[in-house]
Amino acid sequence: MSAPTRSFEQLLAEAEQQPFQGWDFSYLEGRMEEAPTSWSYAEMVRARLAGVPAVLDMGTGGGELLARLAPLPPGTVATEAYTPNVEIARARLAPLGVEVVPVVGAPDNSDQQPGEGRGNLPFPDESFPLVINRHESYYPAEVIRILQRGGSFITQQVGATH
């Protein structure tokens, strides 16, 4: 392994100059390494999309992943808490018939206190047979509330402490 030619601070300064839109980290291509998983979140979701009339994508970012899963059920809805991403997601997902709903995000899962709030998902009880969530904080009780009886919740989370 060769020594890096640039310091961490130089790399950080370079990264901060990159435009940040949606959930597109392509500027990191070739600059980071990840260990591959034995499973694919996208493929797990794709397998569950077949035959459901609606899906909720919590924290869609710029809608990049959800758009790659098209065709989508007619009742597909996405939420996004990061205000700059809402319009990016709408532009990407509206042509696919997806409504993007701005929300206030839940606290990080590891920071939630027992009995803290029901969350902020503006949907009636048992609205969705499938709820997907990639890297978005959530209140478990709120997911249970909006998930139809017998429905599926698929999530992919990351973090140093959980």
What are these regions, as identified by a protein language model?
Residues 20-27, 32-54, 64-68:
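Conserved alpha-helix/loop element of class I SAM-dependent methyltransferases that forms part
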Residues 138-152:
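A short glycine-rich, Lys/Arg-flanked "PGG" loop and its adjoining helix->strand segment in the class I
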Residues 54-121:
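Class I SAM-dependent methyltransferase SAM/SAH-binding core
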Residues 48, 122-124:
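Structural alpha-helical scaffold elements that stabilize or flank donor/cofactor-binding regions
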